Amino acid sequence: MRNLKKTRRIQILLVAGGALVLSTALIGYGMRDGINFFRAPSQIVAEPPAAGEVFRLGGLVEAGTLVRGQGEEITFKVTDGGASVPVTFTGVLPDLFGEGKGMVGTGEMVEGTFVAREILAKHDENYMPKEVTEALKEQGVYRDPAQPEG
């Protein structure tokens, strides 16, 4: 009788463990398209992403690179001070988007150019996304907007 209880307990634990592993795998599989990792331009140059991989690119819009094409097509470069990545975007840019301003875009690399599906700009003069701030600090080009220049 005692041996039967022990066997039953082991069976229940194995089934529960298997169910936990299966549910975790299914949740991870279901969320794989919703997870977009952040990358700075220096990281992309050092370690190019896989073909078709959707990720977020962030940095500063490089001065002198913003070109408006036909229709709603825009090209520019994003930099973190260490490297620059060319970007194309077709659509309406946020009002606060501009050269020298922080941005984060979601998209993928196509033949060396980041093709953005969505562009987000910082929402006021002092805010910068945490990932962009960290990438700029790593490159040594971050300037605190709260501190006066000079």
From Swiss-Prot:
Result of changing H123A: Loss of function
UniProt key word Glycoprotein: no
The keyword Transmembrane appears for this protein: yes
Entry-linked SUPFAM superfamilies: Heme chaperone CcmE (SSF82093)
Binding site for heme: H123, Y127
GO biological process terms on file: cytochrome complex assembly
Superkingdom to which the source organism belongs: Bacteria
Protein name as catalogued: Cytochrome c-type biogenesis protein CcmE
Gene name of the record: ccmE
